[in-house]
């Protein structure tokens, strides 16, 4: 399988992997009933006809099913991965072979990453995208910061706070020189809205809303119950240990594992390690989450307590500097350190750059400290489940990506009469329940139906929604 004749608007590792990718996409479709049902229901209506979606989300087999669902609903699409290690090269090749522009290679450099992100916004045939589908907020940030600099506020470009910002800001400077005047303003004016996949990106959106700088309506997909309580929890429960095992071949049973953070991702991560036979420690800043962890039987400690005790360390907080250089110096020889939060700054990887690095295999490095102690770092502190393994299973991603599809429809086709302002929204409870319902038959669930008198007794409709908006699942 090769790309369509004359189509070369893509960058992938090896287009000859497309046939392999297509076979795996076919397998994944069987495990993604929500997306397939969405194609069947909405395909004839073409609600995304005319939509030009700039997608920045891990270019995996499951994402390929999402991309082809959006296309089946009428959208024109350009796609990049939102992490330098998360691309599955056969998935990217299959999408390119289908004639959809994609720019994604597993192990791309930071310079490549930001160059590819910029390519999202130069639409083939001219023009710009009118929708963003984001994971982590980098595509959204590219436009916001590009417009800020274009409008004259450029001081921040000379003050990068990380290696990644240094590369990103250099790209923005280049764009300001090479692109026509008003380039970012034209992109910003074209876009109708953004749907955001993950916790980190949602934090960025709420920060912009609070500051009054959010350029378009946004839908927070992450806080749909059928995303956060399934993808974040059950997805991590399966994929975390998969990544650690593939990276290290270590025996998990009997090891002491430390999980930083006990939100939904941390809960899934702790369960993953416990099921593998680890003795699990947890750290938390939130007394409610700390109490939950203790009631689940985990020992709640600080990172300082855990550093000399644990064999395996996992960060899952969405915050920065969770594992510091001081913590790493206190660890056992060849402790395994990894992250399952979106960005690599949960671990102070930058502080290790001047130490001796020995690459064991792709995304597995041994770092030697001056005293001879060694540490195993997975995926350079980026997402371990996607860098060292294949990410979450297809079934749980079907729920997340069905929410993404419905969010794109809401913002593009259903934003009538100013329904959505320049604010952050969540999908209504009725759609959350719909997404769940679409996945029941696949796993043999028989749903009990309320009788009319029962529905009246608890004050709900027979067909739902069954819970109030403030209900915590």
UniProtKB/Swiss-Prot annotation:
NAD(+) binds at residues 198-200, 232, 261-266, 284, 319, 340-342, 385. PROSITE patterns: ADOHCYASE_1, ADOHCYASE_2. Keywords: Cytoplasm, Hydrolase, NAD, One-carbon metabolism. The keyword NAD applies. Its EC number is 3.13.2.1. Gene3D superfamilies: Adenosylhomocysteinase-like, NAD(P)-binding Rossmann-like Domain. GO terms for molecular function: adenosylhomocysteinase activity. Transmembrane segments: none annotated. This is Adenosylhomocysteinase. SMART domains: AdoHcyase (SM00996), AdoHcyase_NAD (SM00997). It is found in: Cytoplasm.
């Amino acid at each position: 399988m090769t790309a369509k004749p004359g189509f070369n608007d893509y960058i992938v590792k090896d287009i000859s992997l497309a046939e392999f990718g297509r076979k795996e996409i076919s397998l994944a479709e069987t495990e993604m009933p929500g997306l397939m049902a969405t194609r069947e229901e909405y395909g004839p209506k073409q609600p995304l006809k005319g939509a030009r979606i700039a997608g920045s989300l891990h270019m995996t087999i499951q994402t390929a099913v999402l991309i082809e669902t959006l296309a089946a609903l009428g959208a024109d699409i350009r796609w990049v991965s939102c992490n330098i290690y998360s691309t599955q090269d056969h998935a990217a090749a299959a999408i390119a072979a289908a004639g959809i522009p994609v720019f994604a290679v597993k192990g791309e450099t930071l310079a490549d990453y930001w160059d590819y992100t910029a390519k999202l916004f130069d639409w083939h045939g001219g023009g710009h995208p009118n929708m963003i589908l984001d994971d982590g907020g980098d595509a959204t940030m590219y436009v916001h910061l590009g417009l800020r600099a274009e409008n004259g506020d450029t001081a921040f470009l000379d003050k990068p706070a990380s290696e990644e910002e240094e590369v990103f800001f250099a790209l923005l400077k280049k764009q300001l020189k090479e692109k026509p005047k008003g380039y970012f303003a034209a992109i910003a004016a074209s876009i109708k809205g953004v749907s955001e996949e993950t916790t980190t990106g949602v934090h960025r959106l709420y920060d912009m809303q609070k500051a009054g700088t959010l350029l378009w309506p946004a839908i927070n997909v992450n806080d749909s119950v059928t995303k956060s309580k399934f993808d974040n929890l059950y997805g991590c429960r399966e994929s975390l240990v998969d990544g650690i095992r593939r990276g290290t071949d270590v025996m998990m049973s009997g090891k002491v594992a430390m999980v930083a953070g006990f939100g939904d991702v941390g809960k899934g991560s702790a369960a993953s390690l416990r099921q593998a036979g680890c003795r699990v420690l947890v750290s938390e800043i939130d007394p409610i989450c700390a109490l939950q962890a203790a009631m689940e039987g985990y020992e709640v400690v600080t990172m300082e307590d855990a550093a000399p005790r644990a064999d395996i360390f996992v960060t899952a907080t969405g915050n920065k500097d969770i594992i510091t250089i001081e913590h790493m110096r206190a660890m056992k020889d060849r402790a395994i350190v990894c992250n399952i939060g979106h960005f690599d700054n949960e671990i102070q990887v930058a502080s290790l750059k001047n130490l001796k690095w020995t690459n064991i295999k792709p995304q597995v490095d041994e770092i030697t400290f001056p005293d001879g102690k060694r540490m195993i770092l997975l995926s350079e502190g980026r997402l371990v489940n996607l860098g060292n393994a294949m990410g979450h299973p297809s079934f749980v991603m079907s729920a997340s990506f069905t929410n993404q599809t419905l969010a794109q429809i809401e913002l593009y086709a259903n934003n009538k009469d100013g329904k959505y302002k320049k604010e952050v929204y969540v999908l209504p409870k009725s759609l959350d329940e719909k997404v769940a319902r679409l996945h029941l038959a696949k796993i043999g669930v028989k749903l009990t139906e309320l009788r009319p008198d029962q529905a009246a007794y608890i004050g709900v409709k027979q067909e739902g929604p069954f819970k109030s908006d403030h209900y915590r699942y």
